[in-house]
Amino acid sequence: MRLLRRRHMSLRLAMLGSVFMLFLFIRQKDVSNQEQAMEKPWLKSLAGQKDQVLDFMLGAVNNIRDVMPKLQIRAPEPPQTLVSTNHSCLPGFYTPAELKPFWDRPPQDPNSPGADGKAFQKKEWTNLETKEKEEGYKKHCFNAFASDRISLQRSLGPDTRPPECVDQKFRRCPPLPTTSVIIVFHNEAWSTLLRTVYSVLHTSPAILLKEIILVDDASTDEHLKERLEQYVQQLQIVRVVRQRERKGLITARLLGASVAQAEVLTFLDAHCECFHGWLEPLLARIAEDKTAVVSPDIVTIDLNTFQFSRPVQRGKAHSRGNFDWSLTFGWEMLPEHEKQRRKDETYPIKSPTFAGGLFSISKAYFEHIGTYDNQMEIWGGENVEMSFRVWQCGGQLEIIPCSVVGHVFRTKSPHTFPKGTSVIARNQVRLAEVWMDDYKKIFYRRNLQAAKMVQENNFGDISERLRLREQLRCHNFSWYLHNVYPEMFVPDLNPTFYGAIKNLGTNQCLDVGENNRGGKPLIMYVCHNLGGNQYFEYTSQRDLRHNIGKQLCLHASGSTLGLRSCQFVGKNSRVPKDEEWELTQDQLIRNSGSGTCLTSQDKKPAMAPCNPRDPYQLWLFV
């Protein structure tokens, strides 16, 4: 075959030479002797087809090139660069000029109250000022007096984020999406609300900030009505939309989302301040992955002094969101595997749940996964519901450490619930029934109010949410526990005994007391049948747990009964003898380590030598 190719090679070269000479002849005739060409029809026809002849000649050249013997080793060719099909963006990275904030911050007085994020300080108070401060605390549950005296446009000082965050660059292709910032408020203090708005305007790139939507959840304070409407007119991209009756955070956010015009929805609370470069990392992550629901690193604005906790360059101990089996959101330190996965501070933190107050999400994805459960009422449980839904239905929750936003964390809510706090239990029942499968039993044992709602079928229609779960082909809750939150301790689905532990001698119940997170003495208290501080489980591992929230175990030390974090946490752990208990047939509760039994002495729980004839050593789960 190779010999045949070589014999034909000279013939092909001769043919190519003839074609080339003919083409030159035609070009010469075409240019220098138009009249002669017109006199000879055959030449006129060939000259008119000169472009086709040229194409034929080039094709012949390519054909011969393809059959020429190739070198077996040639210089490496650089890989082809895939050019973006998005012609509306340029290659490379955004420049600082392109990411210029919507508004420049006005000149700052470094000695003004709270300047550069410092604490508000005041040494001497008049009676009138003291009264104003106390009224502010009563109404808002933070120091509104201090907030009112801090500039609405205060600076937060220099950018103290880690160097990799400060130096982070953002690609133009795909372009960073635009965002609508949605802020829900109800009778919010004037200064905290507007400082939140100004903070967004002074830190968000103009090309990315489409609008700020203030959603009023039926505020009654006069300053939040016409005065606010008139004030925001000067802020250009800020507008107010209103709910005429109090419906709560969930429906207010849905209202804001329904009128938002940008590609991404960014939700903030009404008492926040945004740090340098907070927005770009959130939007960049969504540009990479539309299913990412991203939260900033939320730092504290002190509720008393309004001091902003600025980020540090090194050594930040990050937290992530979690939940307990009463379906309460909380924070925990990162597990070791998550620390190892992250190479530097630009890497997102995977989080099993999120606080839900401050986050960004693609508007299209928000709608795809079912927005919020619009049958949930007011506030409570919506963040845990959305956490389960996002993870189980193919998305992911992440915290972006390079994005820093301050938040005033209050110790209690200043607002009343139109239907009382039962709305929280109702919301939690809805999320448990839709997303938790059989694991919902664990929750109902800890919340008797919720369990009663289920028995009475008093939590609304969930058929639409169940249909959503089916349509999205979501994972079950077991998948979530194994793949998203394997560190979560799962109590027995069907514990041996659970409920309150009643002493037959005193007719009182064992009680952990108020705010006992372990280390405090237990007490005896009137049995109230409400669970809570009197809820215990006797497990298949034979430990006695008080595990409404944190997993706490009874342990015996001499004659003392104690409460501490359970030593058995699942695989590769065991129950120590001083946490192991035997519930005997004659109603004693005997500790395996000490051999002593639980008793009530002087109306206090204690340990004593076992005596089945002593009524103060007899106990019953009720």
Swiss-Prot record:
Annotated spans, Catalytic subdomain A: 176-285
GO biological process, one term: protein O-linked glycosylation via threonine
Record: residues binding Mn(2+): 269, 271, 407
Gene3D superfamilies cross-referenced by the UniProt entry: 2.80.10.50, Spore Coat Polysaccharide Biosynthesis Protein SpsA, Chain A
Main enzyme class: transferase
One Pfam match: Ricin_B_lectin
Cellular localisation: Golgi apparatus membrane
Cited CDD domains: pp-GalNAc-T
Residues exposed to the Cytoplasmic side: 1-8
Cofactor list: Mn(2+)
Region (Catalytic subdomain B): 348-410
Pathway of action: Protein modification; protein glycosylation
Domain Ricin B-type lectin residue range list: 506-622
Positions glycosylated per UniProt: 86, 476
Disulfide-bond pairs as recorded: 509-527, 553-566, 597-610
Lumenal side: 29-622
Membrane spanning stretches: 9-28
PANTHER family named in the record: N-ACETYLGALACTOSAMINYLTRANSFERASE, POLYPEPTIDE N-ACETYLGALACTOSAMINYLTRANSFERASE 6
Family, similarity comment: Belongs to the glycosyltransferase 2 family. GalNAc-T subfamily.
Domain notes: There are two conserved domains in the glycosyltransferase region: the N-terminal domain (domain A, also called GT1 motif), which is probably involved in manganese coordination and substrate binding and the C-terminal domain (domain B, also called Gal/GalNAc-T motif), which is probably involved in catalytic reaction and UDP-Gal binding.
Protein task: Catalyzes the initial reaction in O-linked oligosaccharide biosynthesis, the transfer of an N-acetyl-D-galactosamine residue to a serine or threonine residue on the protein receptor. May participate in synthesis of oncofetal fibronectin. Has activity toward Muc1a, Muc2, EA2 and fibronectin peptides.
Protein name from the UniProt record: Polypeptide N-acetylgalactosaminyltransferase 6
Gene: Galnt6
